[in-house]
């Protein structure tokens, strides 16, 4: 169980300042700001566990997702410090937020969360333009086409 507490990592100074996805210094006093969301690996089991044992942290995580959305234009996929690593596919912040919302964990702007979920998921990135046009993502056009189609 202690392995579930290794990451995400708190990524702010004691006064709430942190470097955002836009590389600027921001300040938060409303929530703790985190990084190293390996959401590809954790959205299925670890984050649902957090909704049971760490509701406050779950709210902080979602508020962090929304701050990253404000600063960088999308929610994190697999972020490291103030960088989008672009090394995973999918938008796994979406099921994390949906699960928390359905469990009544909502100390964040729910309207903004819905906007961020739609914006992040419907960008014509990761082959989505092919899926919209022909119903699948051809392997000749995108790597990991089967996973991205599914």
Predicted regions and their residues:
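Conserved oxyanion/phosphate-binding beta-strand-loop segments in alpha/beta enzyme cores
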Residues: 1-31
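Alpha-helical support elements that line or immediately flank enzyme active sites
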Residues: 1-12, 35, 41-58, 98-104
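Phosphate-binding glycine-rich loops and adjacent basic patches that engage nucleotide phosphates
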Residues: 8, 21-28, 55-60, 73-77
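Short, solvent-exposed loop/turn and secondary-structure capping segments
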Residues: 10-17, 48-51, 59-62, 76-77, ...
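Short acidic, glycine/Ser/Thr-rich loop/turn "cap" segments at secondary-structure junctions
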Residues: 30, 44-47, 77-82
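Secondary-structure capping and boundary motifs in well-ordered enzyme cores
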Residues: 32-41, 86-93
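Active-site cavity-forming subdomains of large catalytic enzyme subunits
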Residues: 57, 65-150
